[in-house]
Amino acid sequence: MLRRQNNFGQKLLVEVKMYGKEPSNMANIVADKFKELGIEKDCMVVSFDLKLMEEVKKILPELKTGYIMPLLLGDLPDTNVDFYALEDFSYNEKIAIQAKIKKKKLLIWTVNDIIKIRKYLRQPVDGIITDELEELKEEKKYLKENNTYFDKYIRIITNI
């Protein structure tokens, strides 16, 4: 599956799920697997475990690493990863500005509703994590093809 990821025309985001009984060298295992498959420059890896992602980043700097935050109250934490994956409910423009200041990418997850997909395509975010890749691609294409000031005005007044 990981070797076929380019067939989707989209970067693959791999989530490492921790359960508490992982070996102490888990960061090495993750980094080694990406190197073994030769996909460290083509994929991104993310986890709820910030320490793991920071260790992977030290071992394999070219691999884009991220920290999943299911709920954020307050400011973005300082991290040594490339991006934050923020749950849709916690998003606001203040957080987007903080991410830019910290020079980190901001991805929003899991956005499967077309209304929310449209919303986030118009927000200052760097990516949308979705199970509805075709809908996302179609909406991006539509926005690119219908991008005059009049089109934008109509979308604002109709809220679509």
Segments from the language model and where they lie:
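Short loop-to-alpha-helix "cap/lid" segments that border enzyme active sites
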Residues: 3-160
